[in-house]
Curated annotation (Swiss-Prot):
It is found in: Cytoplasm, Cytoskeleton, Microtubule organizing center, Spindle pole body. The gene is SPO74. Residues 1-87 are annotated as: Disordered. This is Sporulation-specific protein 74. It comes from the Eukaryota. One of its GO terms (cellular component) is meiotic spindle pole body. GO terms for molecular function: structural molecule activity. Keywords: Cytoplasm, Cytoskeleton, Sporulation. Residues 69-83 have a biased composition (Basic and acidic residues).
Length: 413
């Protein structure tokens, strides 16, 4: 039985049982020697019908015997070549040995069997292979540094931290709430202690309490906070203007005391008796009218409180007389200051130093003129310029209305 017919038979049968476990061991030499006698006996013996199992066993035995006979022939040929190689003095390992031939013979046999093919030569299915591949873990700490290798650990800085902008904003908000609100509250307390700004301070206090205690919309809260800051800025501007005005007035009032001026008797009419009685107070009534009610206010002048404070000339055309309508001492009538020049005013009024500001509208921004008469030195001119400049910085619409008595009384103290 040839090897081709053996393989065809094995492929048809598909090896229902595993060929690895069913192959028998090599038969004994005695059974091989009696091969011829067994063949003769089979010829002489009557023919018997073989079952399917007997045929399988006989085919298996035939394959094993054929393999053994082939190995025996190879062994005999190798011995013959060994003797020939000894005569030729060739290398002993130049021809394949018996074990190598047996290994190749068994390898070729087992690789051609159907069981080996089904077990070790299955085609690769890509779909089943992809199913076994797990999803890789994404690396989130991807470094964009151009330097290769592992970077050394560094402490987080102001620009490297991921939450720098958020934390910085939180710190700024906490700083504003703790420090700015405290500053505004203290400024409002200072405004409440101020006499001319008390009413404005009360309004600022109401806004501050509304911002602090009531839960309002963010935009409205920011609006209130901006108004408070603007009010405080206005308060400081007005306070500075009032301080400059007060300093200028004090310099002006102290100027005659620092100079060696002649006595008041030199300017007095010698025919008038000396009256040592004190001057009447402001609220004293004469002829049914007070000192302020005796004279009318001009239409184009006002003081820094928004009230008209300049006095107009009397009906008879003379200068205002202060104590009695029948006063003997009368001065010459003069024109208003706005309708005459400086030289004419000095010529007609010898006491122009006392009335130089009569009729001047300071609040409307009229610049001060330079009077270079006797007794007007540089310090006086600077003080007067500062006084007129401070009047222009005051907003009359924001000032509370007060009477003349209150105004004059607090400024003198």
């Amino acid at each position: 039985m040839g090897a081709g017919t053996l393989l065809n038979g094995l492929e048809k049968e598909n090896f229902p049982n595993n060929i690895h476990s069913d192959l028998p061991a090599y038969p004994n030499m005695d059974s091989q020697e009696d091969g011829n006698t067994s063949k003769e006996s089979k010829r002489n013996s009557p023919v018997k019908q073989k079952s399917q199992k007997d045929e399988e066993k006989s085919s298996k035995m035939g394959t094993a015997s054929n393999i053994f006979h082939e190995n025996k022939d190879i062994h005999e040929r190798s011995e013959h070549t060994d003797d020939f190689n000894d005569g030729l003095k060739l290398a002993p390992d130049s021809s394949p040995s018996l074990k190598e031939c047996q290994f190749k013979n068994w390898e070729s046999f087992w690789c051609n069997t159907e069981g080996y093919k089904t077990k070790h030569m299955q085609p690769f299915h890509f779909t089943s292979g992809l199913e076994e591949i797990k999803e890789p873990v994404m690396e989130l700490n991807i470094s964009t540094s151009p330097y290769k290798g592992q970077r050394p650990n560094s402490a987080p800085t102001e620009y490297s931290a991921a939450t720098t902008a958020f934390t910085k904003t939180q710190l700024e908000v906490s700083f504003l709430k703790t420090n700015l609100l405290t500053y505004i509250k203290k400024e409002i307390d200072i405004c409440l202690s101020s006499v001319p700004f008390f009413d404005d301070a009360v309004q600022m206090q109401k806004k501050f309490l509304e911002y602090r205690d009531i839960d309002l919309d963010e935009e409205y809260e920011l609006k209130i906070l901006g108004e408070l800051l603007n009010d405080l800025n206005f308060f400081h501007m007005q306070e500075n203007s009032l301080l400059n005005r007060e300093l200028a007035v004090r310099r002006f009032s102290n100027q005659p005391e620092s100079q060696n001026l002649p006595s008041i008797r030199d300017f007095r009419n010698p025919l008038l008796p000396i009256d040592n009685r004190p001057s009447p107070p402001l609220g004293l009534k004469r002829n049914g009218k007070s000192f302020e009610e005796t004279y009318d206010f001009t239409s184009n002048t006002s003081n820094f409180w928004g009230e008209k404070a300049e006095l107009q000339n009397s009906i008879t055309g003379g200068t205002p007389y202060f104590f009695h309508p029948n006063n003997i001492h009368q001065t010459k009538p003069f024109m208003s200051f706005e309708n005459q020049n400086e030289l004419l005013f000095q010529r007609k009024n010898s006491d122009y130093k006392q009335h130089f500001n009569s009729g001047r509208n300071i609040h409307n921004g009229v610049e001060s003129k330079s009077y270079r008469g006797v007794g007007l030195n540089d310090s006086y001119q600077k003080g007067y310029a500062a006084m007129t400049k401070s009047f222009g910085n005051i907003d009359l619409n924001r000032m509370p209305r007060r009477s003349n008595e209150e105004m004059y009384s607090w400024s003198r103290n």
